[in-house]
Regions:
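Acceptor-substrate binding/catalytic loop of class I
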Residues: 172-189
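A C-terminal cap/extension of S-adenosyl-L-methionine-dependent methyltransferases
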Residues: 169, 203-255
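A conserved beta-strand element that flanks and buttresses the S-adenosyl-L-methionine
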Residues: 125
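Conserved class I S-adenosyl-L-methionine
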Residues: 2-56, 58-67, 152-174
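A short glycine-rich, Lys/Arg-flanked "PGG" loop and its adjoining helix->strand segment in the class I
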Residues: 137-150
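Class I SAM-dependent methyltransferase SAM/SAH-binding core
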Residues: 68-113
Length: 255
């Protein structure tokens, strides 16, 4: 798989951004069960919370496509005011433990044309959506529009073991069963999209050097931690790790 231009960049009208229906499903959640899956989510949550720690207490966060409930619960527990927006009511199912208690709001909207005024939320998060987006540059632009301060999202980098993703796809399908092909990105593509939205990438957190499918295949969290620790210390993960979590901040006047 190679980085490709945004397939929907020239015409976003009428495009249905509904990949979050799949990532909000119970079927998708099974990928993250067991020790390795929990470890994946622990790394993701830890990095995300560190990237957002400059926000004031009680800051408002919009989690776009977050019906997978992979980050909203951690944001809620950290004291943020969280709204999750999804493309369909079915995306709210996994959030019920929080929405039914009033700890989180869920709203349905067109994710390519969010129904919020400019700068409505202190920060916006978006996980598991970009590589399946019908118009990824349009999605980033919309995240930037409604964010007052920061946008945090993840993406699979081509500057990583993902360069072998086409060869590993059959193994990935055999292990995950419901896997889909996905877009890969260069860091420059992501930086450019944020620049066009009036933001600048300030921090990047590559997560794993080895492909996640190999960790799932090994199915041993302690072994995965052991394998990733030395390459992280050597700085290899920083250069060649994926997925990458980035935080982009709104440009100030004159910046």
């Amino acid at each position: 798989m190679t980085p490709r231009p945004d397939p929907g960049a020239s015409n976003r009208s009428g495009l249905a951004e509904d990949a979050d229906i799949g990532t909000s499903s119970e079927d998708y959640a099974r990928r993250f069960r067991g020790g390795v899956g929990r470890w994946f989510l622990e790394i993701q949550a830890r990095n995300t919370l560190k990237l957002l720690r400059e926000l004031p207490a009680g800051a408002s966060i919009l989690d776009v496509g977050g019906g997978h409930a992979q980050i909203a619960p951690q944001l809620i527990d950290a004291g943020y005011e969280v709204t999750v927006v999804g493309s369909d009511p079915v995306c709210a199912v996994r959030l019920a433990p929080w929405t039914t208690k009033g700890r989180c709001r869920f709203e349905v909207a067109n994710l390519q044309a969010l129904p919020y005024a400019d700068r409505s939320f202190d920060a916006v998060t978006c996980f598991r959506l970009l590589p399946h987006s019908v118009s990824w540059s349009g999605l980033i632009g919309e995240l930037c529009r409604v964010a007052r301060r920061s946008v945090v999202l993840d993406y699979p980098s081509i500057r990583s073991a993902n360069i072998l993703s086409s060869r590993l796809f059959q193994l990935k399908r055999a292990i995950e069963l419901n896997t889909r092909e996905f877009l890969l990105f260069t860091p420059s593509q992501i930086h450019t999209a944020f620049t066009e939205g009036g933001f600048i990438v300030r921090k990047e957190r590559p997560q794993f050097l080895l492909p996640m499918v190999l960790h799932r295949w090994g199915n041993h969290a302690a072994l995965s931690r052991f394998a990733e620790a030395p390459v992280r210390l050597l700085g290899l993960t920083r250069w060649f790790g994926s997925p990458i979590i980035v935080r982009a901040d709104r440009r100030t006047a004159g910046a």
